[in-house]
Amino acid sequence: MHALQAKILDPRLGSEFPLPAYATPGSAGLDLRALLKEDTLLEPGQTILIPTGLSIYIGDPGLAAVILPRSGLGHKHGIVLGNLVGLIDSDYQGELMVSCWNRGNTPFTIAVGERIAQLVLVPVVQAHFDIVEAFDESQRGAGGFGHSGSH
């Protein structure tokens, strides 16, 4: 398991609400909670930025973190991330914020302390461009959207 530096920015985290943790030994994501001042109503079509009360410092350029939606919120209530995926660079040290978007048709209340997203560490390979005049041939070539078949 990789050690991750973290700062608790909201004293309720770790006392009233548990610190992010893996739910099972096979879990990939750490649940992030809505550390709001009060329950917040998210109207259909509305997007709000929600604090998590936590900042992290990854420090290793070979790693990044992604903030992903929780499947149940999206499927059952239409609550997804406003930016679809949040990317946390290894040198970022600010508070983790979650952009929540209600893509559904009914208002949804986000309760203080509710699990709203998940944080997943991922490996990163940094690349540089090697400018060429032509690519080596491949089977696919420049075939794009729909190129490999309709189903």
Swiss-Prot record:
The keyword Calcium does not apply. Belongs to the dUTPase family. It comes from Pseudomonas putida (strain ATCC 700007 / DSM 6899 / JCM 31910 / BCRC 17059 / LMG 24140 / F1). One of its GO terms (molecular function) is dUTP diphosphatase activity. It comes from the Bacteria. GO terms for biological process: dUMP biosynthetic process; dUTP catabolic process. It is an enzyme of class 3 (hydrolase). It catalyses: dUTP + H2O = dUMP + diphosphate + H(+). The keyword Hydrolase applies. Its cofactor is Mg(2+). This is Deoxyuridine 5'-triphosphate nucleotidohydrolase. Keywords: Hydrolase, Magnesium, Metal-binding, Nucleotide metabolism. Pathway: Pyrimidine metabolism; dUMP biosynthesis; dUMP from dCTP (dUTP route): step 2/2. Its EC number is 3.6.1.23.
